[in-house]
Swiss-Prot record, chain A:
Keyword hit for Amino-acid biosynthesis: no
Residue ranges annotated for the ABC transporter domain, each copy included: 5-237, 249-492
Binding-site residues, ATP: G37, E38, N39, G40, A41, G42, K43, S44
Protein name, UniProt field: Ribose import ATP-binding protein RbsA
Family under the similarity heading: Belongs to the ABC transporter superfamily. Ribose importer (TC 3.A.1.2.1) family.
Biological source species: Chelativorans sp. (strain BNC1)
InterPro entries cross-referenced by the UniProt entry: AAA+_ATPase, ABC_carbohydrate_import_ATPase, ABC_transporter-like_ATP-bd, ABC_transporter-like_CS, P-loop_NTPase
């Protein structure tokens, strides 16, 4: 086998931050090369370079021995490189056939021929999908197949899969892996990015590990165990990241949700969290965790449900009511919902508590500056000062600002939705320490995370959601990835009542 | 690398960073004061072209003419900061103007002006409520208000201009009067500009208006009822438009239903030349004033040098495009 693609000495800097540090990466035709690493390790940036979405600061790309320069995704596609994105990039209102031939529709469309050609490609993949169906009507698994068909129709000779099974059920995932195997046997080069290391061990020929933008190792898959992959990814034993769990008893149940229903993904949820307790919400993407957080916080409308703080019911119609009740939300989408990205650290930090600093509507600047200065020092936000725009911070430090704006305001409950997504390892452990401190100060903490290590490492209890319901509750002795996934995928509720009477020591 | 090369390498790098730093300083200077630089250059050019330009009389005249545009531009600035737009102000101006003229004979001056201003507030309240609570696009809603308000102005007057009678002589006196060399409307305009600057720089309202324009969802999820702020900016804009209408009625002595057609575009142009971003979140009151003055000076120069009216329009359009391109370049270099 020969190298189809060689990336040599790839570097990428975003502002002052190095996202990739001199990374070498090669893919042979007819192999599956897995790329693993934590969130923020640089996988997406490296694949961005390979697919023409990111222009590297330094380094060379060669395809079949010829040096290429990709300045747009179109250049990469022309060189035979296609990427199946995590968020699929299909036009939802167009048909399957139109999407497959999107970028080379003839001026005058022969609809019959278009569908015939599309059907032919889909057949080759072994899937029966109607070329005339509208993309928006297809389930996610089929849309992914359409993406692959599109890549093949472009004569892709290297296909990048970015977390393809994250959104699939087990049987769809198995079919997808089989499809990838058959593509491999046809001589297609494949880059496979996944957090599911069992899949990686199953399908990959070679494994490359990135950590914090650097290449850690490239190994033959058969020579490396899953445990070893984890150690290479994290760079230190996992347990050291999370700190010590609480051993003293929790306080009273200060936060309770009763029969919360809001749309199809939040169905009749009831649970409580005690003071000082960190409760995890686990489950697959799309199981309703984010929707639950938003419904509690009043960010989305809810159909029914009561929320209790300190035993008495509070009326929450919008986020303002939630804030008044002492509830804070660190949203999933940091840039879109967590921060005003072009405003300064100072403005973002005091946004939740502006009234304190402006008794008559006029902001007391000195007071505000002192407050923010102390806050960012306590949270170890690395910045050029409190007037630096949040944009200039790394992801981890941006997240600390988002948490910082809630520290004083969310005096009772803080809900964190994927707080360490896209955050480097160093900042991660700092954020974990902050979360622990928030709980130790007597708050009820609700933590949503798709990172199972994180859930198990931080939480005192994990509620597993699946299709809008709580499917199971796991206690520390039961923390097990397989258990969590199978509970989330269960169709029938395993358990809808939730225990709250046990002690953490137990 | 030999040690010597190393040192040289290090030095040249240090020089580069220093240059880079100076470059950034220069750019942040032009971003802050870019409009001011254009303004100063224009004043110099105008003074060179016409010896009449820098006379006290011409300057005060220019300021008085620009005062209504500036007053409305301050209102528009608040709207634009929230990523909105208010196309109705030219028509709301007419409503304010005709109400003041209509009611003055019977109700007296203070009451008629108050009613005119309240009418402006109501127009803004209607637009703001629809935009904030029903999430309708500002462009469409204020476009609708533009025709509704214009129609109302014609209905109120029966299509005829209303002459100000003697009961309203105080208004004419105010709009045409001076304190020393400074016309009253210019003083009023200055007070509004200062107030606008203060609100945007030192109050939580101003800060949140800008933040909403940058990322409304983040502000909402911080526990702020963003809709109220959005309603408020349209109310401010409506109020300023009605105030401008009252002033124009005073200055011309007529409440005319067809006054102010197209003013909204002039005002938006002033705001944009002043460096405010139509994408929200960025802009300030003083630069908006400069934006309005730049337009006024260009008009004034062309008048002084006898450029025909139609040609003036073409040149104005070109100036707006040039100003926006300039800002775009500055912003790209900044990021």
């Amino acid at each position: 086998m020969t190298d189809f693609v060689q990336l040599i000495g790839i570097e990428k800097h975003f502002g002052g931050i190095a996202a990739l540090k001199s990374v070498d990466f090669t893919v042979k035709s007819g192999e599956v090369h897995a790329l693993i690493g934590e969130n923020g390790a640089g996988k997406s940036t490296l694949m961005g370079v390979l697919s023409g979405n990111v222009i590297p600061t330094a380094g060379t790309i060669s395809v079949e021995g010829c040096v290429r320069r990709f300045s747009t995704p179109g250049d990469a596609i022309a060189a035979g490189i296609a990427m199946i994105h995590q968020e699929l990039v299909l036009a939802p209102d167009l048909t399957v056939a139109e999407n497959i031939f999107m970028n080379r529709m003839p001026r005058l469309i022969d609809w019959a021929k278009l569908r015939r050609d599309a059907a032919q490609i889909l057949d080759r993949l072994g899937f029966e999908i109607d070329p005339g169906a509208t993309i928006g009507d297809l389930p996610l698994a089929q849309r992914q197949i359409v993406e692959i068909a599109k890549a093949l129709s472009l004569n892709a000779r290297l296909i990048i899969f970015d977390e393809p099974t994250a959104v699939l059920g087990p049987s769809d995932a198995r079919r997808l892996l089989n499809l990838i195997r058959s593509l491999r046997s046809e001589g297609v080069a494949i880059v496979y990015i996944s957090h599911r290391l069992d899949e990686v061990a199953d399908i990959a020929d070679r494994v490359t590990v990135l950590n914090d933008g650097s290449l850690i190792a490239t190994r033959a898959a058969k020579d490396v165990t899953i445990e070893e992959m984890v150690r290479l990814m994290v760079g230190r034993p996992i347990s050291a990241l999370f700190g010590e769990k609480r051993t003293s008893p929790f306080g009273a149940e200060i936060f309770r949700v009763e029969s919360l229903t809001a749309g199809p993904l939040v169905q009749d949820l009831s649970f409580g969290v005690r003071a000082g307790e960190i409760v995890g919400l686990g489950g697959l993407i799309g199981s309703g965790r984010t929707e639950t957080a938003r419904a509690i916080f009043g960010a989305d409308k809810r159909e029914s449900g009561r929320i209790f703080i300190d035993g008495s019911q509070v009326k929450i119609r919008d986020p303002r009511d939630a804030v008044k009740a002492g509830i804070g939300l660190v949203p999933e989408d940091r840039r879109g919902q967590g921060v005003v990205i072009d405003a300064s650290i100072r403005i973002n930090t005091t946004m939740t508590s502006l009234r304190r600093f402006s008794p008559a509507g006029i902001i007391k600047r000195t007071f505000e500056r002192r407050f923010v200065g102390e806050k960012i020092a306590a949270l170890k936000v690395k910045s050029a000062g409190i007037d630096a725009p949040v944009q200039s911070l790394s992801g981890g430090n941006q997240q600390k600002v988002v948490i910082g704006k809630w520290v004083d305001v969310a005096s009772k409950v803080i809900i964190l939705d994927e707080p360490t997504r896209g955050v480097d390892v160093g900042a991660k452990s700092e954020i974990y320490a902050i979360i622990r401190r928030l709980a130790d100060e007597g708050r009820a903490v609700l933590l949503i995370s798709s990172d199972h290590q994180e859930l198990f490492g931080l939480c005192d209890r994990v509620l597993v959601m699946g299709r809008g319901r709580i499917r199971s509750e796991l206690l520390p002795g039961e923390f097990d990835e397989e258990r969590l996934l199978s509970a989330s995928l269960a169709i029938e509720p395993i358990q809808t009542t939730v225990r709250t009477d046990q002690n953490p020591a137990g | 690398m030999t040690p010597l090369q190393n040192v040289q390498h290090f030095r040249s790098n240090a020089i580069k960073t220093e240059r880079h730093r100076q470059g950034v300083k220069f750019l942040s200077f032009t971003r802050r004061y870019g409009t001011l630089v254009i303004f100063v250059l224009l004043v110099a050019a105008a003074a060179y072209i016409s010896t009449d330009f820098l006379t006290l009389r011409n300057v005060m005249n220019l300021l008085r003419q620009a005062s209504t545009t500036i007053i409305m531009a301050i209102g528009m600035l608040f709207v634009v900061l929230t990523r909105g737009i208010d196309l109705s102000i030219g028509s709301v101006l007419a409503v304010g103007g005709v109400i003041a003229a209509l009611l003055a004979p019977e109700w007296g001056l203070p009451a008629s002006i108050a009613v005119a201003l309240v009418a402006g507030l109501i127009c803004g309240l209607a637009c703001g409520t629809l935009i904030a609570y029903l999430r309708l696009p500002p462009f469409v809603i204020t476009l609708a208000m533009m025709t509704v308000a214009r129609g109302s102005a014609f209905i109120l007057t029966g299509g005829q201009p209303i002459m100000l009678n003697d009961a309203a002589s105080g208004l004419s006196a105010f709009a045409g009067g001076y304190i020393g060399p400074v016309p009253y409307p210019v003083l009023l305009m200055a007070a509004i500009v200062l107030l606008g600057t203060f609100v945007l720089m030192f109050t939580s309202f101003g800060r949140l208006v800008k933040a909403i324009g940058s990322n409304e969802e983040a502000v909402r999820l911080s526990g702020i009822r963003t809709q109220r702020y959005i309603v408020a900016v349209y109310v401010i804009s409506g109020f300023m438009a009605a105030l401008a209408g009252v002033l124009i009625t005073g200055r011309t002595g007529v409440g005319a239903p067809n006054v102010g057609v197209g003013f909204e575009l002039q005002v938006i142009a002033a705001v944009v030349i002043g460096g405010a971003s139509l994408m929200g979140g960025r802009g300030d009151a003083l630069n908006t004033v400069l934006g309005a003055l730049i337009l006024a000076i260009i008009g004034n120069i062309m008048n002084l040098s006898n450029v025909p009216g139609y040609t003036q329009q073409v040149i104005m359009g070109a100036v707006i495009v040039a100003a926006v391109i300039l800002q775009k370049i500055q912003n790209q270099k900044m990021s």
